[in-house]
């Protein structure tokens, strides 16, 4: 697998983070953005993605599994119980492709006939190397579903170039094939 360092000449600019060692890559062309995007999405095994507002939104579906959510001190693990599918949403800055943290993300699942299965807030998932917003779901069974993702505009989060993520974003993924069950650990 090709490493990011071998991808060419990326400009680096300081971020607005309090950490002076944190930098963001400024991609010089759409071709570089597309190459980096292909790497990120292939590496993370996402099923699809869309650009929406200031974000690049991607989804991943899998069997239900133990999930870990960050809480004070250390991650807390949650058993899926009767839930039979995991839906995860990754949200990147559209321009820098950095993961955007601190968002309120809501997902609505609709069956293939357009009937609402449910709506749930997806908290941030702590998964080393695969940080996402996600949750286990109880779905009627295997099949094609539509996913509606709502990302609320944050109160204080700002992009590296000083422009806020200023408005809520809605994005839909259609005919997402979801297999239900539990991962064996």
Residue positions per predicted region:
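Short beta-strand elements
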Residues: 160-185
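Beta-strand-rich domain onsets/edges
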Residues: 7-86, 184
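Short, solvent-exposed, Trp/other aromatic-anchored flexible loops in extracytoplasmic proteins
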Residues: 90, 119-154
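Short structured motifs
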Residues: 43-45, 72-75, 104, 118-121, ...
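Exposed beta-strand and adjacent loop surfaces of beta-rich binding modules
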Residues: 84-86, 102-106, 144
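Non-globular disordered terminal and juxtamembrane segments underlying protein topogenesis/assembly
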Residues: 23-24, 64, 146, 170-178
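Short flexible loop/turn segments that cap and initiate beta-strands
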Residues: 93-110, 116-119
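Beta-strand-rich structural segments
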Residues: 83-95
């Amino acid at each position: 697998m090709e490493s990011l360092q071998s991808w060419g000449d990326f400009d680096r600019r300081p971020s607005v983070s309090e950490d002076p060692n944190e930098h963001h890559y400024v991609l010089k062309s759409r071709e570089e953005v597309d190459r980096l995007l292909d790497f990120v999405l292939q590496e993370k095994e996402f099923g699809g993605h869309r650009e929406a507002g200031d974000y690049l939104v991607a989804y991943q579906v899998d069997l239900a599994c133990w999930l870990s959510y960050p809480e004070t001190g250390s991650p807390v693990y949650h058993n899926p119980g009767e839930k039979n599918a995991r839906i995860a949403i990754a949200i990147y800055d559209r321009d820098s492709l950095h993961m955007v943290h601190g968002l309120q993300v809501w997902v609505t699942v609709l069956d293939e006939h357009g009937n609402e299965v449910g709506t749930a807030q997806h908290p941030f998932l702590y998964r080393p190397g695969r940080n996402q917003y996600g949750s286990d779901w109880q779905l009627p069974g295997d099949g094609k579903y539509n996913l509606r993702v709502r990302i609320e505009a944050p109160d204080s989060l700002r992009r590296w170039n000083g422009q806020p993520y200023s408005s809520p974003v809605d994005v839909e993924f259609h005919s997402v094939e979801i297999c239900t069950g539990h991962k064996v650990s």
